[in-house]
């Protein structure tokens, strides 16, 4: 079973304030998840080639041909605020 320390740590990382009842519930659930992971660790994968996807993934490239774009007026038509042909947005970085 997951320890209270693990539950407190995970709750802190997720910025959650848990009641003792919630901690007990989540400790049981986390313990169940860890048990399933232990079961997966026991699976014999000798001779199995590692993969990132169940099926082969290939990129399909389209020709990079220039195409007409939007006019400035069309691009800014729905912008809530604009200045000098640019969209004005709130500052997000100090």
Curated annotation (Swiss-Prot):
Gene3D superfamilies: Glu-tRNAGln amidotransferase C subunit, N-terminal domain (1.10.20.60). Keywords: ATP-binding, Ligase, Nucleotide-binding, Protein biosynthesis. Pfam families: GatC. GO terms for molecular function: asparaginyl-tRNA synthase (glutamine-hydrolyzing) activity; ATP binding; glutaminyl-tRNA synthase (glutamine-hydrolyzing) activity. It catalyses: L-glutamyl-tRNA(Gln) + L-glutamine + ATP + H2O = L-glutaminyl-tRNA(Gln) + L-glutamate + ADP + phosphate + H(+); L-aspartyl-tRNA(Asn) + L-glutamine + ATP + H2O = L-asparaginyl-tRNA(Asn) + L-glutamate + ADP + phosphate + 2 H(+). Disulfide bonds: none annotated. Its EC number is 6.3.5.-. InterPro entries: Asp/Glu-ADT_sf_sub_c (IPR036113), GatC (IPR003837). It comes from the Bacteria. GO terms for biological process: glutaminyl-tRNAGln biosynthesis via transamidation; regulation of translational fidelity; translation. Belongs to the GatC family. Heterotrimer of A, B and C subunits. Allows the formation of correctly charged Asn-tRNA(Asn) or Gln-tRNA(Gln) through the transamidation of misacylated Asp-tRNA(Asn) or Glu-tRNA(Gln) in organisms which lack either or both of asparaginyl-tRNA or glutaminyl-tRNA synthetases. The reaction takes place in the presence of glutamine and ATP through an activated phospho-Asp-tRNA(Asn) or phospho-Glu-tRNA(Gln). HAMAP family: GatC (MF_00122). This is Aspartyl/glutamyl-tRNA(Asn/Gln) amidotransferase subunit C. The gene is gatC.
């Amino acid at each position: 079973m997951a320890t209270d320390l693990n539950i407190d740590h995970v709750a802190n990382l997720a910025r959650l304030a848990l009641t003792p009842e919630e901690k007990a519930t989540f400790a049981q659930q986390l313990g169940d998840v860890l048990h399933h992971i232990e079961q997966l660790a026991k699976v014999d994968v000798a001779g199995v080639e590692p993969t990132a996807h169940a099926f082969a993934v290939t990129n399909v490239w389209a020709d990079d041909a220039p195409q007409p774009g939007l006019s400035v007026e069309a691009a800014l038509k729905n912008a809530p605020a604009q200045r000098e042909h640019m969209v004005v947005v709130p500052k997000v970085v100090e």
